[in-house]
Amino acid sequence: LVLSGPPLGYELEGSDKVLKVAGPLIRRFRPGFEVRDEFDPANYASDITVGERFFEDPLRVDFMTISLALETIGEIDRVTGAIAGLALPTWVGHGDVDRLVPVWASEPLESVAAVRKVYDGLGHEILNEPVGLDIADEMAAWIEQTLGL
C-alpha cells in the first residue's frame, strides 16, 4: 500500500464545526447542498504553479456536496479506527508543510509496520514537487524491496 498525504485526521474549525453538527439535518433536506471553501493554489505544493494548473483543470469541481463532506469525515473516522489491524506493508509520504492534510494526520500509521517519510519543505502534492521524481524513485525502490523484485 502506497499513500501520499493520507487524510487520517482532521481539525474542524469555525463553520466546519457547524457543518458536522448541522450537516446531517441539512443533508436530510438538501443532500446536494454545496459546501464551498476558499481554495488557494499555494496550498498544493511549494511550486505555486502546481496549484494553478490544478485550478485551471476544466474537470475540477470547486465544491463538494454536504453528503460527500459528511461521508468523507465518517470514512476518515472509520479508517483511522481500523489502522491497528492494517497488515499490508505500507509506505507513506507526507510533506511537512502540507496545508491540506496536516502532517500529524499520517502519524497513526507509525503504530503499524509502515514506512513513513516526512519531506521537509514540501506541500500536499509531494510527487508534483521539483523533487517528485526522486520521491517516486524512493517509492519504487521500496516496492521492489518489499516484493523481493
Question: Language model features by range: what are they?
Answer:
Residues 1-65:
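Alpha/beta-hydrolase-fold enzymes
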Residues 2, 91-93, 117:
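Hydrophobic/aromatic beta-strand patches that form the interior of the parallel beta-sheet core
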Residues 61, 99, 124-126:
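Short strand->helix junction
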Residues 64-83:
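Active-site nucleophile elbow and catalytic-triad environment of alpha/beta-hydrolase enzymes
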Residues 83-87, 111-112:
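Short, conserved loop/helix-junction motifs that constitute active-site signature segments
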Residues 86, 92-94, 98:
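Short beta-strand/loop motif that positions the catalytic acidic residue
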Residues 99-105:
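Conserved alpha/beta-hydrolase "acid-adjacent" motif
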Residues 114-149:
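Catalytic active-site module of serine/aspartate enzymes centered on a nucleophile-bearing elbow/loop
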